[in-house]
Amino acid sequence: MKPRIAVFKFASCDGCQLQFLNAEDELLKLAELVDFAYFPEARSRAVEGPYDITFVEGSITTPEDARRIIRVREESRYLVTTGACATAGGIQALRNWADIEQYRRVVYPNPEFISTLSTSTPISEHIKVDFEIWGCPIDKHELLSVVRSLLSKARPALPSHSVCMECKRRGNVCVVVARAEPCLGPVTRTGCGALCPTFNRGCYGCFGPADDQNMESFVRLLAAQGITGADAVRRLRGINGYVRPWRETADAIGKTIK
């Protein structure tokens, strides 16, 4: 019997699920090797677990989602989180620094019908996660690499060095040095191919923190560019803002703002 793959969605935009479909020809080859037992984005057939490999997109933002992810974990041999929402809480984690009750009153005409948590949190804060694929959205080649590794009973190995290394490989002129552009590249993991710096834009941190980051040095770099206080906090509280090293750094800076 073919290995069974499931793809579940929580609070997210569907962009990381679409990377499966963007694989196109590679997806067709993969479909010959596995059974996509549960993948509502791609097919109407839904087969109940257990599953050999489960991919989860999205963060936990409601009480029902918090219960549902536990059931998904119980049905999965390997569980892989995909994308910034699942690995770091996503852009919606900005609510974690705000008053969710105020949002409910302002946004919804009948807030009493809205069942939501006060926070948006990554999957790893609720269950055991076997592997993580970072990005907003994830890179389809990294996704396929993880699938191939797990099917081969090998541990997936994805790059975790900084975007700066990718810029060096591509021969990019450093946007920080040459253009004085604010850039999260020194503390962001590779995976995008240094997309923004290649077009003379600073990195926005879509792929989360690199393993070899130095946040103290990075804060000094921002300060040297005149980026301090609330502006520095805003740059860190982005797509992956709730991931621990960036969250702690932004919170520390925030405490110095008068």
Each PLM stretch: what is its role?
Residues 1-55, 60, 65-66, 70-78, ...:
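Iron-sulfur (Fe-S) cluster-binding modules
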Residues 85-90:
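Short gly/pro/ser/thr-enriched loop/turn and capping motifs at secondary-structure boundaries
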Residues 93-94:
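Active-site-proximal loop->helix
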Residues 98:
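Short beta-strand elements at the ligand-binding edges of bilobed clamshell
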